[in-house]
């Protein structure tokens, strides 16, 4: 399966890879330096330095894999339908609540900031919907809930959305 990402996503990942690669030598040196502190079984500094070094290298591999397996998508939508990076005011009739979400790529998903992946059940339900449409969010087999699109404010792929950490 390929991750559908924008050119902006790819650029952000390349920037992070470059930044992390610039830190690799210093992290490697820290591992070497702390290794000299003595018995490795009781050397917390060494374990911490090694963990940071491995975390950095793991993130580089993860980002490179994401880039290598990405399918580049264009950010386009019609003026009256929900598209990628749009701000959408959603009404939940069952709870009588309103919420504003932003539809984003999987790499920029951040539920706590109301940035919802277009590939999530919620994202799939609202993508392409128009103001006034009531769509059903299929959470799992046998359970779904309705949401109504109240307002669409067109957004764009800007630098305000960081890529997600893992």
Model-derived segments and their meaning:
Residues 162-166:
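Short solvent-exposed strand/turn elements
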Residues 157-161:
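Short A/G/S/P-biased low-complexity tracts
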Residues 73-156:
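Non-DNA-binding regulatory cores of transcription-related proteins
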Residues 1-71:
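N-terminal intrinsically disordered, low-complexity, charge/repeat-rich segments that act as generic
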């Amino acid at each position: 399966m390929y991750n559908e990402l924008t050119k902006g996503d790819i650029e952000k990942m390349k920037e992070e890879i470059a930044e992390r690669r610039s830190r690799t030598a210093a992290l490697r040196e820290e591992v070497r330096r702390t290794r000299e502190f003595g018995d490795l079984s009781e050397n917390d500094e060494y374990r911490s330095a090694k963990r940071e070094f491995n975390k950095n290298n793991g993130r580089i591999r993860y980002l490179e894999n994401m880039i290598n397996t990405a399918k580049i998508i264009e950010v386009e939508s019609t003026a009256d339908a929900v598209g990628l990076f749009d701000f959408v005011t959603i009404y939940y009739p069952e709870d009588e609540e309103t919420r504003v979400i932003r539809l984003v790529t999987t790499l920029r998903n951040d539920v706590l900031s109301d940035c919802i992946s277009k590939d999530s059940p919620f994202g799939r339900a609202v993508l392409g919907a128009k103001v006034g449409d009531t769509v059903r969010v299929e959470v799992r087999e046998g359970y779904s809930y309705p949401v109504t699109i109240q307002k669409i404010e067109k957004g764009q792929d800007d630098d305000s959305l960081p890529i997600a950490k893992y």
